[in-house]
Amino acid sequence: MNTQILILAISAFLCVRADKICLGHHAVSNGTKVDTLTEKGIEVVNATETVEQKNIPKICSKGKQTIDLGQCGLLGTTIGPPQCDQFLEFSANLIIERREGDDICYPGKFDNEETLRQILRKSGGIKKENMGFTYTGVRTNGETSACRRSRSSFYAEMKWLLSNTDNGVFPQMTKSYKNTKKEPALIIWGIHHSGSTAEQTRLYGSGNKLITVWSSKYQQSFAPNPGPRPQMNGQSGRIDFYWLMLDPNDTVNFSFNGAFIAPDRASFLRGKSLGIQSDAQLDNNCEGECYHIGGTIISNLPFQNINSRAIGKCPRYVKQKSLMLATGMKNVPENSTHKQLTHHMRKKRGLFGAIAGFIENGWEGLIDGWYGYRHQNAQGEGTAADYKSTQSAVNQITGKLNRLIEKTNQQFELIDNEFNEIEKQIGNVINWTRDSIIEIWSYNAEFLVAVENQHTIDLTDSEMNKLYEKVRRQLRENAEEDGNGCFEIFHQCDNDCMASIRNNTYDHKKYRKEAIQNRIQIDAVKLSSGYKEIILWFSFGASCFLFLAIAMVLAFICIKNGNMRCTICI
């Protein structure tokens, strides 16, 4: 009897074997590992690098109005030492300073030098206007062998005012200049510190010297400090240069009685530019927007690990050499063990025994889309990509890199460490600030990429679930989920039927009657098969009970007829 039940169950199951459709996603044999907020080293199908490490060892100047200052220092363009004669006025949007460049000829320095350098780097070039100063009672042709052209000369944009005669009296003078332009004027003047008191008397006469400069926003007095200093360029004296930005319609006044280096022309800034200190060669055949001392960074990535002091439209500098941004779904490739198992199970169970747990295991053969279907029916087996869900995921992931760039993009300026003794403390603060910013942005970069990676993986999983739910809602009671991403269909589903499921045009009512009949038959088989062991044990128990009952009846009859005697001893 039990054997008959088992044979009937197997026969019924073979007769009603269901067609099947499964859902899966794309996988590759070798994915890329990324980090998320919750886990490090997650393997994804696609990822892109966000940290640029490739440097172009040239200054790419194509499309730029570039000026290469050569031996002229940028500050020198405002006062005019001989090496800067050709750059007294210029227009540029890319200014290149060289290591060999020098701002001065007569030894000295600029006050607040680095701030002025930053202003000029962004200036777009400079133009000049004569300030209209005239002098009587003094000489205006002071010159020095430190500033040689064909012979001794002086700064082209400055006047070295001297007494009419050696040791002669230098008169008290006042000069004024009003800025009538619509943009600020850069005004530069100098204070001459003679190599000795005797030299100062010879040049400007005896007595204390005082220079006072004032405008509506500025007032400062200067006294020269004569005395011996180490010789530079054959000179023991020094000239210190000072400057101010004079607003439109404002007036600057100079009151002096010697030791004054007077401005001859005011400088005006032309527009906007980038300035970079570099000895890299100019290349007019490549374009760039981000520069550093070693060349050009050409990149569309949000971060770079090349130089922390790059300027222009640059990726953010971070300490990490690599930060991978996920642009595809989580990847679990079919390894060799899995492929062997797949082959074995196909022989044993067909195509769909190989893709159990489809959400954890992708299909390496699904190359036309990120998501897709595999089916098995009387006509054979097939695989097809689902373009709608793929496109939905792609649309949301496309532009992730650009959005990351928007969050991090900024125009950078270069602040060098060329500070004088008074400014060294400021320089230390700037360096500390720069290091702190790098630390912050290195952390921010890692966090931003991890957030985006988390979102990408969650997004692609969500699209997979949406696709699965779409199929489940269509099939309804006409199919049963097997828990492995597949649906066993309780009716004959040919290729057109499978296509209607994929296209979301499946009509479950059309197949409902056939599906219900097959479901009842299959459920009955499953029920019989499921209770097989219970029936066997029940039959065994009933047989044992029947055997004991017969034995007891026979014993009773024998005792009654005297054929058997039972003696009980106490």
Swiss-Prot record:
Extracellular side: 19-533
Gene3D superfamilies linked to this entry: 3.90.20.10, 3.90.209.20
Record's subcellular location: Virion membrane; Host apical cell membrane
Disulfide pattern: C22-C486, C60-C286, C72-C84, C105-C147, C290-C314, C493-C497
Site feature Cleavage, where: R349, G350
Signal peptide range: 1-18
Keyword Transmembrane helix: yes
Any one Gene Ontology BP term: fusion of virus membrane with host endosome membrane
Keywords for this protein: Clathrin- and caveolin-independent endocytosis of virus by host, Clathrin-mediated endocytosis of virus by host, Disulfide bond, Fusion of virus membrane with host endosomal membrane, Fusion of virus membrane with host membrane, Glycoprotein, Hemagglutinin, Host cell membrane, Host membrane, Host-virus interaction, Lipoprotein, Membrane, Palmitate, Signal, Transmembrane, Transmembrane helix, Viral attachment to host cell, Viral envelope protein, Viral penetration into host cytoplasm, Virion, Virus endocytosis by host, Virus entry into host cell
Other comments on record: Major glycoprotein, comprises over 80% of the envelope proteins present in virus particle. The extent of infection into host organism is determined by HA. Influenza viruses bud from the apical surface of polarized epithelial cells (e.g. bronchial epithelial cells) into lumen of lungs and are therefore usually pneumotropic. The reason is that HA is cleaved by tryptase clara which is restricted to lungs. However, HAs of H5 and H7 pantropic avian viruses subtypes can be cleaved by furin and subtilisin-type enzymes, allowing the virus to grow in other organs than lungs.
The name this protein goes by in its record: Hemagglutinin
Organism of provenance: Influenza A virus (strain A/Equine/New Market/1/1977 H7N7)
Gene: HA
